[in-house]
Amino acid sequence: MSEQDSSSPKYMRFLLGNFTSAEMVTDGNFLIYCIEMGLLVIGVLENIFMIGAVFSTSCLHLNLRILICNCCLGFILMAVGRAMIAVPLCIAHLRDVDISSHAWCFIANAVHHSSADSVCLSFVFIMLERTAGTIWSKDYEKTKIHIFPCIFAFLQWFIPMFMILGNFLDRANRMEHFLLYPHLPCQIEYLTPTMFMITIFIIVIGFIASVGGITIVYNKNIKKYNTRDIWFNTVNLSERYQITENIRSTHLLFPLLALMLIFSTLSVSVLIYGGYWVSVMTKEPARFEEVVKWFGRGGEAAQLFDIITAIYTISFPICAFICHPNLFRFLRKFIGWNSYAVRPSNLNEIGGFEMSTAPIRTQTEFHFQELSRQWNT
């Protein structure tokens, strides 16, 4: 692709030219990065608060609490990965200096991608944990077997890290393609096409398995709950509690899965849109102005993906608090909006308190006066 005819061409990601670091991060890029960082700060604080809330309540089984907190940790690390990418680019725009390197940006992308994959896989392992709670509902609440969540949490991170290793070893690396054009290291997409397709495949299969598995678990627990034989034996109180909690926790997961489906659909739509205009620019350079109009000089349209992810980071804890009664009660108590609490009354506010300190004769007279008043009315 040849350089533009103008002696000082305007920057565009897929045009050759001698551009400065400040030019390679457009004003639109910088503004979107600032908005994204603001949203991610809110999301990180919410997820930290949710971790504290989940571990502070005993309404959920400890195994489930571990996996939910592991999911929140994935959101936090995903935000950290994005900050590692966005902050050097913002500095490049403001100070016209690139403080990053390919090693730094590869690690940042690895943290971001592995955390995003871990979040998507979290529902699969939560579904497996709820399946175990359904199968062994009689003893699951009393038996403290924490090897399940430890193995599940390990796999939840091992699979994405294994995929990152495969991406690093993939020969179809896109580094040479991106280095042909003026890009800062953190503007390069280090995920190869092969690993991108594998990632999408695993996420889709995991989502289908999560929805199907949670639906089966929910219906199975409803069927157990409607079985009246277990309610007349005090020995089975633990089973009764476990079945009830299985229903409440799986009921919580359906809105979270719906939330994941909505944001995943939006994200994939943005990726398809961005991929289309990138292919147009690389194959039909004459359509330069059209690409600039619909994709942006700095690929601003593709940054909608990061904004959607940041909004998802914020929405996940909010949805969890609203959909689970005990978590919602914890939130209301924390912010002081607790209608369940009974305001303590002072003794002098209680009706008839003044008579409690009066002499016995006065109390007796008052008692018969009240009786006379009631009989005469």
Curated annotation (Swiss-Prot):
Bilayer topology term: Multi-pass membrane protein
GO cellular component: plasma membrane
Keywords in alphabetical order: Cell membrane, G-protein coupled receptor, Glycoprotein, Membrane, Receptor, Transducer, Transmembrane, Transmembrane helix
Protein location: Cell membrane
Extracellular side: 1-34, 93-105, 166-195, 273-303
Membrane topology, Cytoplasmic segments: 56-71, 127-144, 217-251, 325-377
Molecular-function annotations in GO: G protein-coupled receptor activity
Superkingdom of this protein's organism: Eukaryota
Glycan-carrying positions: N18
Membrane-spanning residues: 35-55, 72-92, 106-126, 145-165, 196-216, 252-272, 304-324
PANTHER family: G-PROTEIN COUPLED RECEPTOR F27E5.5-RELATED, SERPENTINE RECEPTOR, CLASS E (EPSILON)-RELATED
Similarity comment text for this entry: Belongs to the G-protein coupled receptor 1 family.
Protein name as annotated: Probable G-protein coupled receptor F27E5.8
